[in-house]
């Protein structure tokens, strides 16, 4: 009987699992709606008083999105003011709802990935995950890897969808231009 050879294991394909990059930590949406006057406008003095009295330490180590769920007049500086109070405590702060927070967190972590370790490699980005990896993370990852990889695939090493193959270097035909 002949020995069974695992061709997938010996293929040299590197599996990259975005789920392994999933940053652990609580996600929190800071909603400005309760701070609005009659749910239509924000008063600067009221917001500043709130910011002065609020316990910002409760956001320590958390991923925070500053958002307003009401259709109201909220100036840009209000989001910035809250961010200046949250940022010293939070692991990450951005503007948006829960979905936008997740996309922003993944974008940050994908951009921190050391893509050089994938130079000239055959990479398959794992497709199945138990955690909510946002679609933009896959797109961002593709953009990061494309300049360095030999090939990029999606799925599992035993069943991949080819996405990209680096062009082969052109050979010098031996003749020189005159």
Across the structure, where does each feature detected by a protein language model lie?
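Short, non-transmembrane amphipathic alpha-helical segments
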Residues: 81-87, 137-146
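A domain-level signal for the structural core that forms small-molecule/cofactor-binding pockets
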Residues: 47-52, 127, 136-137, 144-145
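N-terminal, charge-rich interaction modules
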Residues: 1-74, 79, 83, 90, ...
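Short active-site-adjacent structural elements
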Residues: 74-75, 103, 132-136, 161-165
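Long, charge-dense
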Residues: 78-117, 155-160
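Short glycine-rich or small-residue beta-strand-to-loop segments that form or flank ligand, phosphate
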Residues: 63-69, 94-96, 122-128
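A generic local secondary-structure boundary/capping motif
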Residues: 4-5, 54, 112-115, 142-143
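Extended, charge-rich low-complexity interaction segments
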Residues: 115-140, 177-178
